[in-house]
């Protein structure tokens, strides 16, 4: 287990416990051979890990001295309000848990994410130095690949695929590229200036996923969820802007503010008859057209 994984394990152990003594932390560590070789955690090692965690993650592990010496995360909001940090910590924590339970490998099922590790590492290096990247790319709807320079702005994980948002130098347009469709990628010595007003979260704030474009404007959308789908909508919102308008025995109305792009429409269709678009009328009509086209495929059965 790497040193980073040990730090993540300690953060996760304290987060899940709320408050926990050093003795209990050491006891849990001793039960994990990869972490300890069954040896106790010394106070010196614990303090060193605690300081490293603050240095690397900005996470403060404090001690409550009244009623016993119990350690806790002093600033949990720094984790909960930072989506990237929370995702990273949760991902490492899950990885650690699975690593501790490899004997259950035939009883743990995960979705396969198209490999993007090598490209992702190079792109992050390019983003660190604002360096132009030369990519060879073949889109799903293309018969051949093309090589061109891009200025990498940000990367995004969406529905088990990694995507790159970049400025296409040749077309002078912002485009999105799937990392699993990149055939080759090369760092160049050319650099670029990231626009001062660019914000990755801001750019995607009114989009459902990775389909973007100036031709579709964000708007207020009301979606009605029926029966058993209501708690699913509450527990896993469609979008960060989602809010509950009203709830009844048979249905609940939710509001989102976003651009009704292709991937959002596909998400609504995926839910079937458990939801209904109430407004705007234009999106409701689009849904009717898709449903009508689907009906045509099956009407002769």
Where are these predicted regions, by residue range?
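Short, basic/aromatic recognition patches that contact phosphate-bearing ligands
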Residues: 1-83, 293-301
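Residue-level signal for tight coil/turn positions that link beta-strands
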Residues: 65-66, 152, 159, 179, ...
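General beta-strand recognition
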Residues: 70, 134, 163-165, 253, ...
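Core beta-strand-centered patch of the WYL/Sm-like small regulatory domain
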Residues: 107-222
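Polybasic (Lys/Arg-rich)
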Residues: 205-301
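Bulky hydrophobic/aromatic content
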Residues: 8, 22, 57, 62-139
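Short, hydrophobic/amphipathic alpha-helical patches that form generic packing surfaces
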Residues: 6-13, 89-93, 265-270
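Short aromatic/basic micro-patch
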Residues: 19, 149, 176, 255, ...
């Amino acid at each position: 287990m790497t040193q980073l994984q040990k730090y993540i394990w300690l953060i996760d152990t304290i987060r899940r416990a709320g408050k926990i003594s050093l003795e209990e932390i050491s006891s849990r560590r001793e039960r994990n051979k990869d972490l300890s070789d069954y040896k106790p955690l010394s106070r010196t090692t614990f303090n060193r890990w605690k300081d490293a965690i603050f240095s690397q993650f900005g996470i403060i592990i404090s001690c409550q001295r009244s009623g016993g010496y119990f350690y806790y995360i002093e600033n949990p909001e720094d984790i909960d309000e930072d989506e990237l940090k929370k995702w990273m910590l949760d991902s490492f924590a899950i990885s650690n848990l699975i690593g501790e339970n490899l004997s259950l490998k035939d009883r743990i099922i995960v979705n396969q994410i198209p490999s993007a590790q090598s490209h992702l590492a190079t792109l992050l290096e390019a983003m660190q130095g604002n360096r132009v990247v030369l990519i060879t790319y073949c889109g799903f709807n293309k018969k051949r690949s093309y090589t061109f320079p891009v200025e990498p702005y940000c990367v995004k994980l969406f529905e088990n695929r990694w995507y790159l948002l970049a400025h296409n130098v040749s077309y002078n347009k912002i485009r999105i590229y799937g990392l699993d469709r990149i055939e080759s990628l090369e760092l160049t010595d050319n650099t670029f200036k990231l626009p001062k007003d660019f914000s990755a979260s801001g750019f995607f704030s009114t989009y459902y996923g990775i389909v973007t474009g100036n031709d579709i404007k964000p708007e207020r959308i009301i979606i009605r969820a029926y029966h058993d789908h209501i708690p699913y909508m509450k527990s896993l919102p469609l979008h960060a802007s989602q809010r509950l308008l009203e709830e009844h025995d048979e249905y609940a109305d939710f509001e989102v503010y976003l651009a009704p792009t292709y991937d959002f429409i596909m998400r609504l269709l995926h839910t079937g008859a458990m939801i209904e678009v109430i407004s705007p009328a234009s999106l409701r009509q689009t849904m009717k057209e898709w449903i009508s086209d689907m009906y045509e495929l099956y009407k002769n059965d």
